[in-house]
């Protein structure tokens, strides 16, 4: 503070003759809007843009002229300026308007119109000009014409004469970018006029086909391109940049995902490109930008990553630098701060070589970052301090503009002098703008001093000797405006009061800061009105120092200032082999330094070569920190040196070599620099496992919960985010698939007790705490915001914490505690609150609830009318163990309706809500369904099911399937560990059900062994209890369930056992297969979803079509002894299986099935197995140096990543240390698979595969033949990535209907002979409801006992469901018109009699020739399931006539069977059908993703638990309830792992 007080005192007392006698001349100009001035270089001429009107001043802004009066005098229509371009030296300007374009080649003195032959695509047009650094007359013009956002067309042009004439570049219609190869001053290895362009070809659907790099040396008269064999032509080249001596291509690592990580390909000649090696990144952003480098052979780049924080802040980045080949990068500065707009917090201070100042993320700092500075081009970094006081750190807030990052033609103009805005120490508040200060340095950042106690905008004149500043409020709050200026490099200051309130927004000098003239842009307000005035001040210091010019020969007026000083040793620092000095005016000299518009030239002095700085690792060597030397990479060395004659020789190679381009002198003879490469021993096979990368991270505490975020709405953020919670209630986040984790840090010591994700908006993450605070992220856990909740979460009361709105991410319901001193307090209850602004405010919704649902977003608005604000709540009934269902359309403000007084819960499935109600006997259940929230229909179950009372329901929501029906499990056996029941299938609206399978297994929590095969409709697996009768007997208390696996290929219409493989993984034949036992005694039986540790582990994958895994055994039923289990694999959707390995394994799919990974479960292991060719061959890979106890194997939910994580404990299960192994296969494949979406015969890496029903004789399944695109298994050298394979899915044809396209209708049951027969004593449904549902219908069909499988698309053939049409009420006329009824007279003879005579004749002939001689009618049977062919019907065929007759007879027999069945089932009167509607709910530990269960037990039993309820899990929704005394609360230590996927 002493220094600061004395500085203020000096400002007040300082009075020299120069200050006393001098005041700058000020000219004030007012404009209608803010003026944006731009100087020509070395000139007093300024262009000014005001609201798209261009002005010009030739006297440093003192007077202005409308440029239109200069260019086009007399024209009425104003020129609307689109943009202005300057050449690199800022001596020429090019003005683009909406209609015409103008240029000046003499700094605005004269103007000339020029034309661009643009094919106008839209009304919004942008122009961008790039000039050749060597010859600025040569230019490339890029135009973009847009109709609307993202609907644009780019065109490229070139000019050889300063745009006076412009020609279009016509080498391709799809140019990505073109650049001069001499786009910087240091591009010395290419010809001056070389132009390099990138082109990209897309198909009609805008999918990538190919890229190319085109080069011309004579302005497109001759063009060279990459050969078709070059791998780059098959990669998505996103852009091109010329960086110093290099041409850099930005290449997407996945050609079908432009947001995938960016690869850099480098070339010096523009013809040969090599991929650069970048260090592994913690982030996945594709953004890469370049910095200026002191050596043109060294590339400096910034790579954007991600930041995890609670401040809502942005991203972090890394500063990278290459070696002098441009191919190998290392990190100079990590965790560089950046914001969401990629504005990097780094700058080249005062344009001095090697001096950079940056903000680096520092979580220990109150600001979240710290300012650091380097004086040796990034080799070392040190804190920025004030007045050389290390305890007074300076935190820079505002950095110079983006231009400081890139190549500039302008040299240093203010040597060592800079002003920045910042804060001192951690005591200041970064959010308080009033605490910001203005700081000055005169030694290029070595020391800083405060000059103003507020924010100021400043400009430099006369090379930094004159400084003009104005106070600036970032909030643009008006205050008395004054100028403050210094004539001695900021040591002393004077002020001028301008006499009005306002704010300055910018101070400008000419480009090289040599002029004494300044322009100040201000906004003024009078305090009485909101209207602002815009003033431009021209401030002239030409009369300062009594107009004296410094005598350059007088040393007392100048000093030699060294540009880079070591902050510790205070000695000059060498960068790029040289030191740098400037001759600058001393601060107290009273004269103008140098001549106007004269550039400063540094004085360079070469340094002696330094072995650590001026030498680098040679090609094929990498620096190793442990040995402190360059160690060889044998694969790189051998590929480069072991060629030709050297294949069997020993080659000597230098470990280090001199950095190309360094200016140092006196080469150093390096010790131990030679390495001998024995080429005869380096030829090793390039095995894939050598390219797998594994990392291991450990945390304190056991893993309790982990979640992979599903692909979100923001596609720029890749699907690699993992969130992990431990038993210590800490949360860690990884954005790179588990390679690195960051702990979610918060200010207070808060414990996280649960993690929720929004199923509808996967980017949203919610961290539940043990307090009344909630942490919310809407950007995939990149940052979190703290939200104060109205109460603590009610998780301990057995309720969920949150439910979400389907269409509004800001709307959710919070379930908290009310009046809870403890959970045993009798007054303790739950209270629901609703927010519509993402937690900023809450309103009470309803008290004493178990859960509430936004059901108004569930129903189908196209079919039904309902209130979108409709909410259903399950509300507790005092002193009762059941709930009641209440509804409201206004959040229970005025509207509240009780729908059902006694329920156990509700659930949603598809667009329905299902309610499980309790009957009057208090012992059984009844289910109702609604599709609009107001009309409910009872769900009718098959009448022939003997299940006694209904005790438990599970709704299986096939949300991954396209089936119009859903499955419903009704428990028929509820004894503990002996649970099973009937699997029922609904009709289209969920009101009636038929039996799909009996005795289907279920666990004690209501989850069912039913699992669909993802992405293949109609295929599902179940486990049935084959000893159900034995279990139902009273003598079976010690008997366990015997499970047998079955599979369906027609959505549950028929089920078959899994065919076992012949041999096991050890090539031994299975005994039951050897004995040729039937499938009933010898089939493959697999553990179901209820028996997996993580039910999110599906048997199949949505992206790896047809590939299935399962753990089980071959035999009569599933072996409960784990020692007899093995892992099985199918690549044809379950038709055939292969044993992979013996033991209990976990599995995962990667890259849409090209990578298969398995690891043994619940065992300490260090090795996994993987396959790259769909399971044909398997390899072992050791992923860790020590064995860990495996808990789970996981990857992204879409199974498209090439990264996997193994979650483990260091010791046995329950050990309090989490270990995460990450296994990365990204470098295993050498290329991306080729896919031509337009030409399937283009010879790419894919083939079509068609799923089949093994019971069918043709290729039809569900009424059609379909094909999916899959990578050819043997093409294991390529990966798929985000290739849109689903777009090539095709239906080859629809098939004729067969028996397998039908299932039994309601009240009909499958008989032993394969036919559907009416249940005794029941009546069929009344199908006339279709007339009421669809007013356009003119007919309906009487029930036949059959209904078509909902997923079947078959046409014609066997029509078992519509034999007898009946007209709809009031549609008789239309019905008669359709079927031609009502004819009389002659028409009857023609229409009826003649065909009847023909039929009788044909019938007699067929009877004699076909039926009678083949044994009569006794040989022909009825319709049976599974008898599509007639192979068992051998008929006499002696000639061609016999063959024709027999074919006709067989057809007639089939037809007669259909008629006979209709006769059987049309005798009963049709019953009426109930109307339609829906249901939703909840999760616990991740269970069957498709299950929602209603559980009930005897209300009068002493066990006291009617149903159980736990916290939410979006994958397994269970509808039940918590009765007093029936609550299970998770232990505080949370030892049990909860692989939740909310």
UniProtKB/Swiss-Prot annotation:
Give membrane topology per the record. Multi-pass membrane protein
Q: Repeat BNR: residue ranges?
A: 56-65, 102-112, 373-383, 439-449, 484-494, 732-742, 1128-1138, 1170-1178
For this protein, the parts annotated as crossing the membrane are: 1388-1408, 1446-1466
> Lumenal face: residue ranges?
21-1387, 1467-1542
Q: Where is the signal peptide?
A: 1-20
Localization (cell): Golgi apparatus, trans-Golgi network membrane; Prevacuolar compartment membrane
Q: Name one GO cellular component term.
A: cytosol
Task: Give the positions annotated as glycosylation sites.
Answer: 41, 454, 633, 714, 922, 989
Work out whether the entry's keyword set contains Mitochondrion. Answer: no
Tell me one GO biological process term. Answer: protein targeting to vacuole
Report the protein name in the record: Vacuolar protein sorting/targeting protein 10
Query: What high-level taxonomic lineage is stated for the organism?
Result: Eukaryota, Fungi, Dikarya, Ascomycota, Saccharomycotina
Q: Which gene encodes it?
A: VPS10
